[in-house]
Amino acid sequence: MKDTTSLFITDSLDSLNPKKDTSILMMEEISNQEGKVFQCEMKDLRYFEQIVQANIVEIKDPISTPRVFTPIDQSLPLKDFNYVFMRKDPPVDDDFMNALHLLSQAELEGANVINRPAALQKFNEKILALRFSAWMPDTKVICKEDDLKNFKDRHSTIILKPLNGMGGELIYKFEELTSKNFEIFKSLTNNFQTMVMVQNFLPEIYEGDYRVLIIHGEPFPIALARFPQGDSFKANLAAGGKGQSREINSVQRKVGKEVGKLLMQEGVVFAGIDMIGDYLTEINITSPTGAREILVQSKQNPIQQLLQSL
């Protein structure tokens, strides 16, 4: 990455935790390799003078808090950077989609955008996993109350989650369908209009929810196993779970390779799959995380491998 320029489109800099954030680790690695690092938010993108541009800052010291940055006096074309990393966290709302449309235009102008905007536009992360339904727990995408009842009749405990959530937000476990739980379902579906996902609950979650990073189509050999704490059933780090680095097993490797084939076809060079036991639950392609924790605990660096593959 020496003598290269990289632009990161992220959430606000002050919201990124240097000790945990994968985007900061990516900036750090590029900076260590004598590349130049720049950053902007989605709101800084614009189409002006017949080209996609961004108002940016240069990141001088990615790991410092607060991070040392220098504003750039002019708006620069995205095509002038060697790499443009789209690293904005969900939700995938209208602003997110409009930014992707601009990034697709920037691609046409010559920008090298990672991951490809077309793939981020095309796939919902939870629905994308349905392409590998043979590896998934029993899963339905529904919005009607009768479908919820029918699904609950098949399983003693079920999980309900929105299609555009992240970090364990708005995920519920139903052991029975109480009036309160019906109200939760009604709320999440916007009065039975918006699709949600239901799955049978996997008790293997207490043995770890594994984040397996997929880099250039190949599973990284070390995963981050996340464990629920206390009475919680949520293993996401953002929801209070604790992570441990673990070597991936043969099933995780097999699923990772299968998913990796599709991702490479779609221009997704960096992704994360989530697996509970032998089951695939999600494919994260927007801004996969977990790399910092893997590096700190195992001393193996997935981001170094990613940058070498570009």
Cite the ranges covered by each PLM segment.
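ATP-dependent carboxylate activation and anion-phosphoryl transfer catalytic cores
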Residues: 4, 10, 16-19, 244-310
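Redox-cofactor binding/interface segments in oxidoreductases and associated redox assembly factors
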Residues: 8, 85-86, 199
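Phosphate-binding site of ATP-dependent enzymes
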Residues: 146, 155-156, 169-253, 263
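Rossmann-like NAD(P)H-binding beta-loop-alpha module
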Residues: 134-156
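Short glycine-rich anion-binding loops that position phosphate/pyrophosphate groups of nucleotides
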Residues: 12, 88-91, 163-165, 288
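Conserved N-proximal alpha/beta basic substrate-recognition cap immediately N-terminal to
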Residues: 14-141
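Short glycine-enriched loops at secondary-structure junctions
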Residues: 117-121, 226-228, 276-279
